[in-house]
Amino acid sequence: ALLEVQGRRGRKSTIVLLEEMLKSDCVSELTEKIQEELAEWKQYDEADSILAYIFAALMKGGLTTDDYNYRTFHAAMREKFPDYNISKGFDWAEALYNAIISEDFSYNTSISEEQIKRGRKHATDIKLRLLSIVNPNTV
């Protein structure tokens, strides 16, 4: 359910369930695939950078119901997948997401060009896997 709560320092946070963020008749299949991507990544790397890749894939693939911000997505992932130890902090992953989707160079300079290239590649690969669920003729 869409819920707005007063956050720290007076910021309003929007809380949305992951299932409500996803567009299509394949919500359960997409959620399952997102969990697979997350589980596979977390076997080898505890970093939350996978969340930036998944969110970029969803946004670039047109698989969300609205134009959500990264923080809303991060909160939805923490709520949906509590067993994966997704950190409460989101600053680095949010900066990485913004760098991945940026068309110009207006991103956080603490993110290296190599991290951005790797992030864009992962996001594209994940996007194709997610789109193949919605439309098997995609790839």
What kind of region is each of these model predictions?
Residues A1-V139:
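Flexible coil/loop and intrinsically disordered linker positions at secondary-structure junctions
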